[in-house]
Protein backbone atom coordinates (compact mmCIF):
# COMPACT_ATOMS: atom_id res chain seq x y z
CA UNK A 1 0.00 0.00 0.00
CA UNK A 2 1.32 3.44 -0.87
CA UNK A 3 2.86 5.50 1.92
CA UNK A 4 1.24 8.61 0.39
CA UNK A 5 -1.58 9.84 2.66
CA UNK A 6 -5.05 9.15 1.27
CA UNK A 7 -6.86 12.49 0.67
CA UNK A 8 -10.08 10.83 1.80
CA UNK A 9 -8.66 10.96 5.33
CA UNK A 10 -9.15 14.74 5.18
CA UNK A 11 -12.70 14.65 3.75
CA UNK A 12 -15.70 15.68 5.84
CA UNK A 13 -17.82 12.86 4.44
CA UNK A 14 -17.44 9.85 2.20
CA UNK A 15 -20.30 8.42 0.14
CA UNK A 16 -19.96 4.67 -0.26
CA UNK A 17 -20.91 3.23 -3.64
CA UNK A 18 -22.55 -0.16 -3.78
CA UNK A 19 -21.27 -3.17 -5.66
CA UNK A 20 -22.87 -6.47 -6.58
CA UNK A 21 -20.11 -8.84 -5.57
CA UNK A 22 -16.41 -9.65 -5.67
CA UNK A 23 -13.85 -12.46 -5.59
CA UNK A 24 -10.61 -11.00 -4.29
CA UNK A 25 -7.46 -11.57 -2.27
CA UNK A 26 -7.12 -8.71 0.21
CA UNK A 27 -3.86 -7.93 1.98
CA UNK A 28 -4.48 -6.46 5.41
CA UNK A 29 -1.95 -4.35 7.31
CA UNK A 30 -0.08 -5.69 10.35
CA UNK A 31 -1.78 -6.26 13.69
CA UNK A 32 -2.12 -3.16 15.87
CA UNK A 33 -2.12 -5.28 19.03
CA UNK A 34 1.06 -7.14 18.10
CA UNK A 35 2.81 -3.98 16.90
CA UNK A 36 2.15 -2.31 20.25
CA UNK A 37 3.33 -5.36 22.17
CA UNK A 38 6.53 -5.76 20.17
CA UNK A 39 7.26 -2.05 20.62
CA UNK A 40 6.89 -2.31 24.38
CA UNK A 41 8.96 -5.48 24.70
CA UNK A 42 11.67 -4.23 22.33
CA UNK A 43 11.99 -0.98 24.25
CA UNK A 44 12.70 -2.93 27.45
CA UNK A 45 15.04 -5.50 25.88
CA UNK A 46 18.22 -3.44 25.73
CA UNK A 47 18.89 -4.78 22.22
CA UNK A 48 18.17 -3.49 18.74
CA UNK A 49 14.93 -4.89 17.35
CA UNK A 50 13.46 -4.57 13.87
CA UNK A 51 9.67 -4.91 13.67
CA UNK A 52 8.62 -5.83 10.13
CA UNK A 53 5.10 -5.48 8.71
CA UNK A 54 4.38 -3.12 11.60
CA UNK A 55 1.08 -1.30 11.58
CA UNK A 56 1.92 2.38 11.15
CA UNK A 57 -1.20 4.11 12.42
CA UNK A 58 -2.03 6.94 14.79
CA UNK A 59 -1.90 4.60 17.80
CA UNK A 60 1.43 2.97 17.02
CA UNK A 61 3.11 6.22 15.99
CA UNK A 62 1.96 7.87 19.22
CA UNK A 63 3.37 4.91 21.14
CA UNK A 64 6.71 4.99 19.32
CA UNK A 65 7.14 8.70 19.99
CA UNK A 66 6.09 8.32 23.62
CA UNK A 67 8.63 5.54 24.25
CA UNK A 68 11.38 7.74 22.82
CA UNK A 69 10.67 10.47 25.37
CA UNK A 70 12.16 8.26 28.12
CA UNK A 71 15.51 8.62 26.34
CA UNK A 72 16.64 4.99 26.47
CA UNK A 73 15.72 4.05 22.87
CA UNK A 74 15.02 5.54 19.48
CA UNK A 75 12.16 4.28 17.31
CA UNK A 76 12.88 4.85 13.63
CA UNK A 77 9.73 4.50 11.50
CA UNK A 78 9.96 3.67 7.80
CA UNK A 79 6.53 4.13 6.23
CA UNK A 80 7.69 2.85 2.84
CA UNK A 81 8.61 -0.58 4.22
CA UNK A 82 6.21 -0.72 7.22
CA UNK A 83 9.18 -1.20 9.54
CA UNK A 84 10.07 0.14 12.98
CA UNK A 85 13.66 -0.12 14.24
CA UNK A 86 14.01 0.15 18.03
CA UNK A 87 17.60 0.98 19.02
CA UNK A 88 18.98 1.41 22.57
CA UNK A 89 20.77 4.70 23.21
CA UNK A 90 22.77 3.49 26.20
CA UNK A 91 21.12 6.10 28.41
CA UNK A 92 18.94 5.27 31.44
CA UNK A 93 15.20 5.75 31.39
CA UNK A 94 14.23 9.19 32.67
CA UNK A 95 10.87 10.91 32.96
CA UNK A 96 10.35 13.41 30.14
CA UNK A 97 10.08 17.10 30.98
CA UNK A 98 6.85 17.43 28.97
CA UNK A 99 3.60 15.50 29.43
CA UNK A 100 3.25 12.40 27.24
CA UNK A 101 0.18 12.76 24.99
CA UNK A 102 -1.15 9.67 23.20
CA UNK A 103 -4.35 10.96 21.60
CA UNK A 104 -6.91 8.16 21.68
CA UNK A 105 -4.42 5.30 21.98
CA UNK A 106 -5.75 3.18 24.84
CA UNK A 107 -3.33 0.24 24.80
CA UNK A 108 -0.23 2.47 24.59
CA UNK A 109 -1.45 4.63 27.46
CA UNK A 110 -2.00 1.60 29.69
CA UNK A 111 1.39 0.14 28.76
CA UNK A 112 3.09 3.51 29.36
CA UNK A 113 1.67 3.87 32.87
CA UNK A 114 3.59 0.78 34.00
CA UNK A 115 6.60 1.59 31.80
CA UNK A 116 6.96 4.99 33.48
CA UNK A 117 7.60 3.07 36.69
CA UNK A 118 11.08 2.29 35.32
CA UNK A 119 11.91 5.94 34.49
CA UNK A 120 13.56 8.15 37.10
CA UNK A 121 11.41 11.16 37.92
CA UNK A 122 7.74 12.03 37.55
CA UNK A 123 5.91 11.30 34.30
CA UNK A 124 2.50 12.69 33.34
CA UNK A 125 0.61 10.66 30.72
CA UNK A 126 -2.59 11.88 29.11
CA UNK A 127 -4.72 11.68 25.98
CA UNK A 128 -7.65 13.23 24.18
CA UNK A 129 -11.01 14.09 25.74
CA UNK A 130 -12.42 10.57 25.38
CA UNK A 131 -9.22 9.04 26.77
CA UNK A 132 -9.57 11.25 29.83
CA UNK A 133 -12.87 9.48 30.52
CA UNK A 134 -11.56 5.92 30.19
CA UNK A 135 -10.96 3.86 33.34
CA UNK A 136 -7.42 3.22 34.60
CA UNK A 137 -8.22 2.73 38.28
CA UNK A 138 -7.60 -1.01 38.46
CA UNK A 139 -4.08 -0.59 37.07
CA UNK A 140 -3.35 2.34 39.38
CA UNK A 141 -4.43 0.25 42.39
CA UNK A 142 -2.19 -2.68 41.37
CA UNK A 143 1.07 -0.78 40.81
CA UNK A 144 1.91 0.38 44.39
CA UNK A 145 2.45 -3.23 45.54
CA UNK A 146 5.17 -3.45 42.87
CA UNK A 147 6.81 -0.25 44.10
CA UNK A 148 5.27 2.21 41.64
CA UNK A 149 3.41 5.34 42.77
CA UNK A 150 0.78 5.97 40.06
CA UNK A 151 -2.23 8.23 40.59
CA UNK A 152 -4.93 9.94 38.57
CA UNK A 153 -4.17 13.67 38.62
CA UNK A 154 -7.85 14.54 39.10
CA UNK A 155 -8.52 11.68 41.51
CA UNK A 156 -11.12 10.10 39.21
CA UNK A 157 -9.27 6.97 38.09
CA UNK A 158 -8.81 8.34 34.56
CA UNK A 159 -6.01 10.22 32.75
CA UNK A 160 -4.04 12.37 33.17
CA UNK A 161 -1.98 9.92 35.24
CA UNK A 162 1.07 10.87 37.33
CA UNK A 163 3.75 8.18 37.79
CA UNK A 164 6.72 8.56 40.13
CA UNK A 165 9.21 6.17 38.58
CA UNK A 166 12.51 4.43 39.00
CA UNK A 167 10.78 2.16 41.46
CA UNK A 168 9.30 -0.88 39.62
CA UNK A 169 10.84 -3.45 41.97
CA UNK A 170 8.47 -6.38 41.40
CA UNK A 171 6.86 -8.55 44.05
CA UNK A 172 3.24 -9.63 44.27
CA UNK A 173 0.09 -7.75 43.35
CA UNK A 174 -3.51 -8.44 42.43
CA UNK A 175 -5.66 -6.78 39.80
CA UNK A 176 -9.22 -6.96 38.56
CA UNK A 177 -9.61 -8.36 35.07
CA UNK A 178 -13.22 -7.23 34.70
CA UNK A 179 -12.67 -3.94 32.81
CA UNK A 180 -9.69 -4.53 30.53
CA UNK A 181 -7.12 -7.23 29.86
CA UNK A 182 -4.69 -4.44 28.86
CA UNK A 183 -3.98 -3.78 32.54
CA UNK A 184 -2.75 -7.36 32.96
CA UNK A 185 -0.68 -7.18 29.78
CA UNK A 186 0.85 -3.89 30.95
CA UNK A 187 2.02 -5.45 34.21
CA UNK A 188 3.31 -8.65 32.59
CA UNK A 189 5.37 -6.83 29.93
CA UNK A 190 6.86 -4.28 32.30
CA UNK A 191 7.72 -6.92 34.90
CA UNK A 192 10.48 -7.80 32.43
CA UNK A 193 12.71 -5.14 34.04
CA UNK A 194 11.63 -5.64 37.65
CA UNK A 195 14.31 -6.29 40.26
CA UNK A 196 12.60 -9.40 41.65
CA UNK A 197 10.08 -11.97 40.44
CA UNK A 198 6.66 -10.46 39.77
CA UNK A 199 3.48 -12.36 40.62
CA UNK A 200 0.19 -11.00 39.27
CA UNK A 201 -3.04 -12.50 40.61
CA UNK A 202 -6.32 -11.83 38.77
CA UNK A 203 -8.93 -11.19 41.44
CA UNK A 204 -11.96 -12.01 39.27
CA UNK A 205 -12.76 -13.13 35.74
CA UNK A 206 -10.43 -11.80 33.04
CA UNK A 207 -12.15 -10.25 30.02
CA UNK A 208 -10.72 -10.42 26.49
CA UNK A 209 -8.42 -13.33 27.33
CA UNK A 210 -6.98 -13.69 23.79
CA UNK A 211 -5.21 -10.34 24.17
CA UNK A 212 -3.25 -11.71 27.14
CA UNK A 213 -2.42 -14.77 25.03
CA UNK A 214 -1.01 -12.38 22.41
CA UNK A 215 1.12 -10.73 25.10
CA UNK A 216 2.49 -14.09 26.23
CA UNK A 217 3.11 -15.17 22.63
CA UNK A 218 5.00 -11.95 21.87
CA UNK A 219 7.15 -12.37 24.97
CA UNK A 220 7.84 -16.02 24.16
CA UNK A 221 8.89 -15.13 20.61
CA UNK A 222 11.41 -12.70 22.09
CA UNK A 223 12.73 -15.26 24.58
CA UNK A 224 10.83 -14.37 27.76
CA UNK A 225 9.04 -17.04 29.79
CA UNK A 226 6.01 -16.40 31.98
CA UNK A 227 4.73 -19.00 34.43
CA UNK A 228 0.97 -19.18 34.75
CA UNK A 229 -1.93 -20.79 36.53
CA UNK A 230 -4.56 -20.53 33.82
CA UNK A 231 -5.92 -17.00 33.86
CA UNK A 232 -5.73 -16.74 37.65
CA UNK A 233 -2.03 -16.03 38.20
CA UNK A 234 0.97 -14.98 36.10
CA UNK A 235 4.56 -14.98 37.36
CA UNK A 236 7.39 -13.26 35.50
CA UNK A 237 10.78 -14.52 36.77
CA UNK A 238 13.34 -11.75 37.17
CA UNK A 239 16.70 -11.69 35.42
CA UNK A 240 15.34 -12.40 31.94
CA UNK A 241 16.30 -10.35 28.91
CA UNK A 242 14.17 -10.19 25.81
CA UNK A 243 16.24 -10.85 22.73
CA UNK A 244 16.34 -8.36 19.92
CA UNK A 245 16.72 -9.13 16.25
CA UNK A 246 13.82 -9.25 13.82
CA UNK A 247 10.13 -9.95 14.40
CA UNK A 248 7.34 -9.94 11.82
CA UNK A 249 3.82 -8.79 12.64
CA UNK A 250 1.01 -10.95 11.26
CA UNK A 251 -2.01 -9.31 9.57
CA UNK A 252 -4.52 -7.56 11.80
CA UNK A 253 -7.50 -9.81 12.50
CA UNK A 254 -9.66 -6.85 13.51
CA UNK A 255 -8.87 -5.12 10.22
CA UNK A 256 -9.52 -8.35 8.37
CA UNK A 257 -13.01 -8.56 9.88
CA UNK A 258 -14.43 -5.81 7.66
CA UNK A 259 -13.56 -7.70 4.49
CA UNK A 260 -14.94 -10.95 5.88
CA UNK A 261 -18.16 -9.06 6.67
CA UNK A 262 -18.24 -7.67 3.13
CA UNK A 263 -17.99 -11.17 1.67
CA UNK A 264 -20.76 -12.33 4.00
CA UNK A 265 -23.33 -9.65 3.13
CA UNK A 266 -22.57 -9.63 -0.61
CA UNK A 267 -22.44 -13.43 -0.97
CA UNK A 268 -18.93 -12.96 -2.31
CA UNK A 269 -15.52 -14.54 -1.71
CA UNK A 270 -12.45 -13.08 -0.02
CA UNK A 271 -9.03 -14.58 0.75
CA UNK A 272 -6.85 -13.03 3.48
CA UNK A 273 -3.22 -14.26 3.21
CA UNK A 274 -0.63 -14.27 5.98
CA UNK A 275 -2.86 -15.32 8.88
CA UNK A 276 -4.26 -18.71 9.72
CA UNK A 277 -5.11 -21.36 12.27
CA UNK A 278 -2.07 -20.68 14.47
CA UNK A 279 -2.95 -17.07 15.21
CA UNK A 280 -3.35 -16.01 18.84
CA UNK A 281 -5.57 -13.08 17.82
CA UNK A 282 -8.99 -13.71 19.30
CA UNK A 283 -10.68 -11.82 16.48
CA UNK A 284 -9.80 -14.66 14.11
CA UNK A 285 -12.73 -16.54 15.66
CA UNK A 286 -15.15 -14.24 13.86
CA UNK A 287 -14.68 -16.76 11.05
CA UNK A 288 -16.51 -19.43 13.07
CA UNK A 289 -19.32 -16.99 13.85
CA UNK A 290 -19.77 -16.25 10.15
CA UNK A 291 -19.80 -19.96 9.41
CA UNK A 292 -22.61 -20.40 11.92
CA UNK A 293 -24.49 -17.60 10.14
CA UNK A 294 -24.30 -19.40 6.79
CA UNK A 295 -20.92 -18.60 5.22
CA UNK A 296 -18.47 -21.16 3.89
CA UNK A 297 -15.04 -20.82 5.48
CA UNK A 298 -11.55 -22.25 5.07
CA UNK A 299 -8.84 -21.64 7.66
CA UNK A 300 -5.43 -22.82 6.49
CA UNK A 301 -1.98 -22.46 7.99
CA UNK A 302 -1.38 -19.16 6.20
CA UNK A 303 -4.69 -17.92 4.83
CA UNK A 304 -8.37 -17.48 5.63
CA UNK A 305 -11.15 -17.69 3.04
CA UNK A 306 -14.78 -16.71 3.54
CA UNK A 307 -17.55 -17.15 0.97
CA UNK A 308 -20.91 -15.59 1.74
CA UNK A 309 -24.20 -17.45 1.65
CA UNK A 310 -27.78 -16.99 2.88
CA UNK A 311 -27.42 -15.49 6.36
CA UNK A 312 -29.30 -16.44 9.52
CA UNK A 313 -29.23 -14.94 13.00
CA UNK A 314 -27.35 -16.63 15.84
CA UNK A 315 -26.87 -16.31 19.59
CA UNK A 316 -23.22 -15.60 20.43
CA UNK A 317 -21.08 -14.60 23.40
CA UNK A 318 -18.51 -12.09 22.08
CA UNK A 319 -16.60 -11.41 25.31
CA UNK A 320 -13.37 -12.84 23.85
CA UNK A 321 -13.46 -10.75 20.65
CA UNK A 322 -15.07 -7.40 21.45
CA UNK A 323 -13.31 -5.42 18.71
CA UNK A 324 -15.16 -7.30 15.96
CA UNK A 325 -18.62 -6.92 17.49
CA UNK A 326 -19.40 -4.02 15.11
CA UNK A 327 -18.35 -6.18 12.14
CA UNK A 328 -20.65 -8.97 13.28
CA UNK A 329 -23.44 -6.46 13.91
CA UNK A 330 -23.43 -5.19 10.33
CA UNK A 331 -23.67 -8.77 9.08
CA UNK A 332 -26.56 -9.38 11.49
CA UNK A 333 -28.42 -6.44 9.93
CA UNK A 334 -28.69 -8.42 6.67
CA UNK A 335 -29.39 -11.84 8.23
CA UNK A 336 -32.75 -13.56 8.53
CA UNK A 337 -33.94 -13.57 12.12
CA UNK A 338 -32.40 -12.14 15.27
CA UNK A 339 -28.74 -12.19 16.28
CA UNK A 340 -28.20 -11.91 20.03
CA UNK A 341 -24.70 -10.61 20.82
CA UNK A 342 -23.99 -10.94 24.54
CA UNK A 343 -21.31 -10.37 27.20
CA UNK A 344 -19.98 -7.17 25.60
CA UNK A 345 -20.07 -4.68 28.49
CA UNK A 346 -16.43 -3.76 27.76
CA UNK A 347 -17.64 -1.99 24.59
CA UNK A 348 -19.11 0.76 26.76
CA UNK A 349 -15.59 2.06 27.54
CA UNK A 350 -13.92 1.87 24.12
CA UNK A 351 -13.17 4.85 21.83
CA UNK A 352 -16.87 5.52 22.19
CA UNK A 353 -19.75 3.62 23.76
CA UNK A 354 -19.85 1.12 20.92
CA UNK A 355 -23.06 -0.58 22.04
CA UNK A 356 -24.90 2.75 21.94
CA UNK A 357 -23.19 3.84 18.71
CA UNK A 358 -23.92 0.64 16.76
CA UNK A 359 -27.49 0.61 18.06
CA UNK A 360 -28.10 4.24 17.06
CA UNK A 361 -26.60 3.95 13.59
CA UNK A 362 -28.31 0.65 12.73
CA UNK A 363 -31.63 2.16 13.79
CA UNK A 364 -30.93 5.06 11.42
CA UNK A 365 -30.73 2.44 8.67
CA UNK A 366 -34.12 1.02 9.66
CA UNK A 367 -32.88 -2.02 11.57
CA UNK A 368 -34.55 -3.12 14.80
CA UNK A 369 -32.00 -3.25 17.62
CA UNK A 370 -32.76 -4.05 21.25
CA UNK A 371 -30.05 -2.51 23.42
CA UNK A 372 -29.04 -3.96 26.80
CA UNK A 373 -26.29 -2.96 29.22
CA UNK A 374 -24.04 -5.74 27.95
CA UNK A 375 -25.80 -6.99 24.82
CA UNK A 376 -27.44 -6.15 21.51
CA UNK A 377 -30.27 -8.08 19.86
CA UNK A 378 -30.30 -7.26 16.14
CA UNK A 379 -33.18 -8.35 13.92
CA UNK A 380 -32.12 -8.43 10.30
CA UNK A 381 -34.04 -6.72 7.55
CA UNK A 382 -33.50 -4.47 4.55
CA UNK A 383 -31.32 -1.56 5.66
CA UNK A 384 -31.70 1.78 3.91
CA UNK A 385 -29.16 4.54 3.38
CA UNK A 386 -28.25 6.99 6.13
CA UNK A 387 -25.66 9.57 7.13
CA UNK A 388 -23.53 7.74 9.68
CA UNK A 389 -22.04 9.50 12.69
CA UNK A 390 -18.72 7.87 13.55
CA UNK A 391 -18.06 9.26 17.07
CA UNK A 392 -14.33 9.66 16.31
CA UNK A 393 -14.25 5.85 16.35
CA UNK A 394 -12.41 4.04 13.58
CA UNK A 395 -14.38 0.82 14.01
CA UNK A 396 -17.75 2.54 13.59
CA UNK A 397 -16.58 4.18 10.35
CA UNK A 398 -15.20 0.97 8.86
CA UNK A 399 -18.17 -1.13 9.92
CA UNK A 400 -20.80 1.06 8.30
CA UNK A 401 -18.69 1.53 5.18
CA UNK A 402 -19.09 -2.21 4.67
CA UNK A 403 -22.86 -1.84 4.94
CA UNK A 404 -22.63 0.83 2.25
CA UNK A 405 -21.21 -1.69 -0.19
CA UNK A 406 -24.62 -3.37 -0.25
CA UNK A 407 -27.00 -0.55 0.71
CA UNK A 408 -27.35 2.56 -1.43
CA UNK A 409 -26.95 5.97 0.19
CA UNK A 410 -24.61 5.30 3.10
CA UNK A 411 -22.54 8.40 3.89
CA UNK A 412 -19.68 8.17 6.41
CA UNK A 413 -18.92 11.32 8.40
CA UNK A 414 -15.28 11.98 9.40
CA UNK A 415 -13.78 9.15 7.31
CA UNK A 416 -10.33 10.18 8.53
CA UNK A 417 -10.93 8.59 11.93
CA UNK A 418 -9.90 5.23 10.42
CA UNK A 419 -6.27 6.43 10.68
CA UNK A 420 -6.27 5.35 14.32
CA UNK A 421 -5.82 1.71 13.31
CA UNK A 422 -6.08 1.35 9.51
CA UNK A 423 -4.94 4.47 7.60
CA UNK A 424 -5.01 2.53 4.32
CA UNK A 425 -8.58 1.29 4.86
CA UNK A 426 -10.18 3.27 2.02
CA UNK A 427 -7.41 2.25 -0.38
CA UNK A 428 -7.82 -1.37 0.67
CA UNK A 429 -11.58 -1.09 0.16
CA UNK A 430 -10.80 0.12 -3.37
CA UNK A 431 -9.49 -3.37 -4.14
CA UNK A 432 -13.10 -4.55 -3.89
CA UNK A 433 -14.64 -1.53 -5.56
CA UNK A 434 -12.64 1.37 -7.02
CA UNK A 435 -15.46 3.90 -7.21
CA UNK A 436 -15.61 5.75 -3.90
CA UNK A 437 -16.69 9.39 -3.90
CA UNK A 438 -15.63 11.92 -1.26
CA UNK A 439 -17.43 15.18 -0.72
CA UNK A 440 -16.28 18.27 1.10
UniProtKB/Swiss-Prot annotation:
Signal peptide: none
Matches recorded under InterPro entries: Enolpyruvate_Tfrase_dom (IPR001986), Enolpyruvate_Tfrase_sf (IPR036968), EPSP_synthase (IPR006264), EPSP_synthase_CS (IPR023193), RNA3'P_cycl/enolpyr_Trfase_a/b (IPR013792)
UniProt cross-references to CDD domains, sorted A to Z: EPSP_synthase
Single GO MF descriptor: 3-phosphoshikimate 1-carboxyvinyltransferase activity
Cellular component aspect of the GO annotation: cytoplasm
Annotated Pfam families: EPSP_synthase
Entry keywords, A to Z: Amino-acid biosynthesis, Aromatic amino acid biosynthesis, Cytoplasm, Transferase
Pathway connected to this protein: Metabolic intermediate biosynthesis; chorismate biosynthesis; chorismate from D-erythrose 4-phosphate and phosphoenolpyruvate: step 6/7
Catalytic reaction annotation: 3-phosphoshikimate + phosphoenolpyruvate = 5-O-(1-carboxyvinyl)-3-phosphoshikimate + phosphate
EC number: 2.5.1.19
Enzyme class: transferase
Superkingdom, taxonomy of origin: Bacteria
Function: Catalyzes the transfer of the enolpyruvyl moiety of phosphoenolpyruvate (PEP) to the 5-hydroxyl of shikimate-3-phosphate (S3P) to produce enolpyruvyl shikimate-3-phosphate and inorganic phosphate.
Family: Belongs to the EPSP synthase family.
Subunit (UniProt): Monomer.
Protein name: 3-phosphoshikimate 1-carboxyvinyltransferase 2
Protein's organism: Streptomyces coelicolor (strain ATCC BAA-471 / A3(2) / M145)
Designated gene of the protein: aroA2
Amino acid sequence: MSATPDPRLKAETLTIRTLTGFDETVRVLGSKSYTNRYLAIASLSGQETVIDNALLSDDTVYFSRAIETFGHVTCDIDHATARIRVTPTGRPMRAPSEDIFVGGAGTPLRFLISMAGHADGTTIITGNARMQERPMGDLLKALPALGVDATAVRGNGSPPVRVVGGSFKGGATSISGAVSSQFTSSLIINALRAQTDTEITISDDLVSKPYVEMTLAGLAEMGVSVDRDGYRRFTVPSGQQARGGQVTVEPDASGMSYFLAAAAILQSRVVIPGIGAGSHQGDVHLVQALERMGCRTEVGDDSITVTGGPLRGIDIDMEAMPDVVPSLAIVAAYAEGTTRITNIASLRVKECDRIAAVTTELRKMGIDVEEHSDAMYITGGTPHGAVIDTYDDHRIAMTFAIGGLRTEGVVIKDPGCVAKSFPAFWQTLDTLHPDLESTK
